[in-house]
């Protein structure tokens, strides 16, 4: 499911996009969560084929990872929160005017329900970000279900 403002683009100048994607993965939710919370290993534990490299950057304060996607795009993400009890990780992409991403992993009959949410500005970026999120979840599913 994707939820993006349905207003005319010219009326969305000051509207923050809120993108929601969910996918069922027939795998142990703890295994998915353990890979997701390993924030420096996206490329080999969570979404190989979608992310090609993850590097933890040195510094004080919140952890920052540099993520290289298969299309060559590189972004720096600040890890805001890792909540093991809720199986929820939150991060922000530094180069956006505003970005708050969250991934949750919930137990479901026969596997896990994974939800990826992003709130972002400028709103126009949703046209690029939403399909990328859907593709990332599909790659995650393929990885954990062994159907790559």
Task: List where the protein language model places each region.
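Beta-strand/loop substructures that line and gate deep hydrophobic ligand-binding cavities in soluble
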Residues: 90-143
């Amino acid at each position: 499911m994707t939820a993006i403002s349905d207003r005319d683009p010219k009326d969305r100048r000051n509207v923050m996009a809120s993108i929601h994607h969910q996918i069922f993965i027939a795998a142990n939710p703890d295994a998915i969560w353990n890979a997701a919370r390993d924030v420096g290993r996206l490329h080999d534990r969570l979404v190989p084929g979608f992310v090609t490299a993850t590097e933890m950057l040195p510094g004080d304060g919140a952890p920052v990872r540099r993520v290289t996607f298969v299309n060559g795009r590189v972004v720096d993400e600040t890890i805001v929160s890792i909540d093991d009890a809720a199986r929820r990780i939150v991060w922000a992409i530094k180069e956006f005017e505003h970005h708050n991403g969250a991934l949750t992993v919930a137990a479901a009959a026969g596997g896990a329900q994974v939800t990826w949410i992003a709130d972002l500005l400028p709103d126009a970026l949703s046209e690029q970000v939403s399909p990328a999120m859907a593709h990332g979840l599909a790659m995650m599913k393929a990885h954990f279900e062994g159907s790559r």
